[in-house]
Amino acid sequence: MTYSPGSPGYPPAQSGGTYAGATPSFAKDDDGKSKLPLYLNIAVVALGFAAYLLNFGPTFTIGADLGPGIGGRAGDAGTAVVVALLAALLAGLGLLPKAKSYVGVVAVVAVLAALLAITETINLPAGFAIGWAMWPLVACVVLQAIAAVVVVLLDAGVITAPAPRPKYDPYAQYGQYGQYGQYGQQPYYGQPGGQPGGQPGGQQHSPQGYGSQYGGYGQGGAPTGGFGAQPSPQSGPQQSAQQQGPSTPPTGFPSFSPPPNVGGGSDSGSATANYSEQAGGQQSYGQEPSSPSGPTPA
């Protein structure tokens, strides 16, 4: 049986929720500061140690014009490499947690190392040539000095570091997903479903009962509230073989009796409503009577 919407026995309809889009969060820095000074200090340390390693290569060579059999490595950059290595050590000390920062001292020492390396390259003694390791060594020392000076300017507030870009956090908490909406509405309990196949004769007969204005037995095609009529499993010739009495409403609903016969004689049979099931299906109260077979009396 079915329940009309709003009645106490009617099941609550499940409302389909909307799909809430995932809102990715962006991870911010803990202190909101740029990490550019940290990267520059790391560069100062790396460039200082690179200059120290390049000093083992041929920075200066003895020319062959000094005499036969004379040639080879003449020496190293000397003081410039020592000063650059000192700047790298001081910058590395400032990277330690809870350590005092020496950005000013590192910048001064790094600039001094760059000036010494440039001076040694320009004031080359006669009979000496610059080896291949001297040029990358000078480049490392100069870049170290530039990085140390930029760190000092950032620390003093002369220049401003760019704001850190928010990074997408793949492990961030996504927004909650709402309930998915139902595909269609569930049929009422007792509502006739679709028939898989057609009935014989190309017609589909649905049982008819009392009128829908009483909230009782309605046609099986559309739900009228109350107790829905169940479709008859038999149709066609099988229905004609069975005769059913008038549909009896359930307990608590008003019953309806056939109307009295109007007139007499042979017309009385045609005036009464036919409550038995005909070959085409059942007829309800108030349905027009079927015309009797045979010739109509004049």
UniProtKB/Swiss-Prot annotation:
Residues 188-298 are annotated as: Disordered. Residues 247-261 have a biased composition (Pro residues). This is 34 kDa antigenic protein. The keyword Lipid metabolism does not apply. Residues 268-291 have a biased composition (Polar residues). Keywords: Cell membrane, Membrane, Transmembrane, Transmembrane helix. It is a multi-pass membrane protein. To M.tuberculosis RV0954.
